[in-house]
Regions:
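Transmembrane alpha-helical interface segments in multi-pass membrane proteins
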Residues: 36-112, 135-143, 147, 151
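Residues at or immediately flanking beta-strands
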Residues: 12-16, 67, 125
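Mechanotransmission and gating elements of multispan inner-membrane complexes involved in transport
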Residues: 1-36
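Perimembrane helix-loop junctions in membrane proteins
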Residues: 59, 116-120, 155
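Short cytosolic juxtamembrane segments of multi-pass membrane proteins
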Residues: 152-167
Length: 167
């Protein structure tokens, strides 16, 4: 029987016998590597997106100095200005998250179709659950708020007299 010889190594063997379990283990290893690479890319994308939001919000604070001064002159508190800019940066994060989900889902569907065309059947199937979508949107909002915290703090600390005197 062949099973009796499965663990024996043959010198100068020109072939390899793999069981379905071996193939599944190799495939799982490949998927784990791909998953790690995708997580790395996602982390870099989040960092770059956060820096982009921070830059956008700093620019927004600079361009809206006079508006901030008027708001504070008519009674807006520091916390009001901080919340305004924090929510705005959170919404920028949500917009970026939505674009990312649309592009990611589109790419996953394309890979699914390409694998179906190349292999004749579907081995990979793209699926976006409502829970994952909601979690991604919430996480995007949080990343946006964190990225916009320093510009929002700067906006909140502006003095009305100084901002209205400028320009």
């Amino acid at each position: 029987r062949l099973a009796d010889y499965k663990d024996e190594e043959i010198e100068d063997a020109s072939f390899v016998i793999e069981t379905p379990e071996d193939m599944l283990e190799n495939f799982q290893t490949i998927l784990d590597v791909v998953k790690a690479v995708l997580i790395g890319i996602a982390a870099i994308s989040l960092f770059v997106g956060g820096v982009g939001i921070m830059n956008t919000m700093y620019t927004s604070v600079l361009e809206r100095n006079k508006e901030i001064g008027i708001m504070k002159a008519i009674g807006a508190r520091n916390v009001d200005v901080f919340l305004l800019f924090s929510i705005e940066s959170g919404l920028l994060g949500v917009a970026g998250g939505l674009i990312g989900i649309l592009l990611g889902t589109g790419l996953a569907k394309a890979v699914e179709e390409i694998s179906r065309a190349a292999l004749g059947q579907t081995f990979l199937q793209a699926y976006l659950s409502p829970g994952l979508f909601a979690g991604a949107m919430a996480f995007s909002f949080i990343v946006g708020v964190i990225a916009g915290a320093l510009p929002a703090l700067k906006a909140a600390k502006l003095q009305p007299a100084d901002t209205l005197r400028e320009e």
